[in-house]
């Protein structure tokens, strides 16, 4: 009975965990996907690395296209677009389309 009450108590609970690029590198150390196709976690890590590279070049955003990300991740365009849309729904990424180019920005705190 206590376990059920505890589950109900946290049913609507939302939790945000702040992570760092270094943590992601640590988590992936020694991990190698046997397929060329990226997992969602690998694709998200790739976005973190792309955002970091953009910031190093003093850009706030990642410039590219869904096709470019699709090729890098070995996904089809629909899957890539749906993934970015899902990340938008989670509030993790902001997306702006300029013609056929996608401008992405991870909603991150720099410190």
Question: Predicted segments — roles?
Answer:
Residues 1-68:
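Short recognition helix of helix-turn-helix/winged-helix DNA-binding domains
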Residues 51-111:
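Winged helix-turn-helix DNA-binding recognition segment
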